[in-house]
């Protein structure tokens, strides 16, 4: 039985990804210096609010995030701040939908919560590979992340190519300070 190779070995020159040397180096540095995937931790009851970050535009993972919230949060009297792609799957729940007609960044979503509750403790709900950035962003703006709940899936048919697989996500995240997700998807032919 063969083991899965480390992520950085998935980006070798002969792969389907057409990456120049600088891009491969950037990816290797990102993989070596970043927490790629998080697991759930902490006690929800220690937070003053729950903030749920969507993952992609499709229903696939966002519906799973909504179901996770429904199963994990029932019984707690804690305000729910849900990004619109998750909120649409929870019409019966009492929540605050974080809506916007244009693309919302992780920081945009966290900023709405901060504006509403101030510097308080929160539980983050996110996709496992997106979770570290959600935690870092919340902490950077003054929200104290005391708990995390995750879904570990990728939406294979999402309109955003960078969320369709672990490899696509890592390529995008390793270049996020220089290109948008759409630019990275086009440049490296993410599918």
Language-model segment annotations:
Residues 156-191:
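C-terminal capping/extension of enzyme domains
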Residues 5-170:
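A structural signal for short, hydrophobic/glycine-enriched beta-strand patches
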């Amino acid at each position: 039985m063969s083991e899965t190779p480390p992520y950085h070995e998935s980006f070798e020159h002969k792969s389907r990804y057409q990456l120049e040397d600088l891009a491969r180096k950037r990816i290797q540095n990102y993989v070596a210096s970043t927490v790629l995937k998080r697991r759930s931790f902490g006690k929800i009851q220690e937070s003053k609010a729950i903030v749920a970050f969507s993952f992609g535009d499709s229903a696939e993972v966002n519906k799973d995030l909504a179901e996770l919230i429904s199963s994990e949060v029932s019984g707690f009297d804690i305000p729910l701040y849900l990004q619109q792609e998750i909120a649409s799957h929870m019409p019966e729940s009492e929540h605050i939908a974080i809506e916007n007609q244009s693309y919302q960044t992780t920081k945009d979503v966290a900023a709405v919560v901060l504006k509403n509750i101030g510097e308080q403790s929160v539980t983050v709900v996110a996709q496992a590979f997106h979770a570290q950035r959600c935690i870092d962003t919340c902490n950077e703006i003054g929200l104290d992340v005391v708990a995390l709940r995750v879904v570990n899936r990728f939406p294979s048919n999402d309109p955003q190519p960078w969320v369709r697989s672990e490899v696509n996500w890592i390529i995008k995240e390793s270049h996020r300070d220089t290109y948008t997700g759409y630019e990275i998807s086009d440049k490296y032919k993410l599918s």
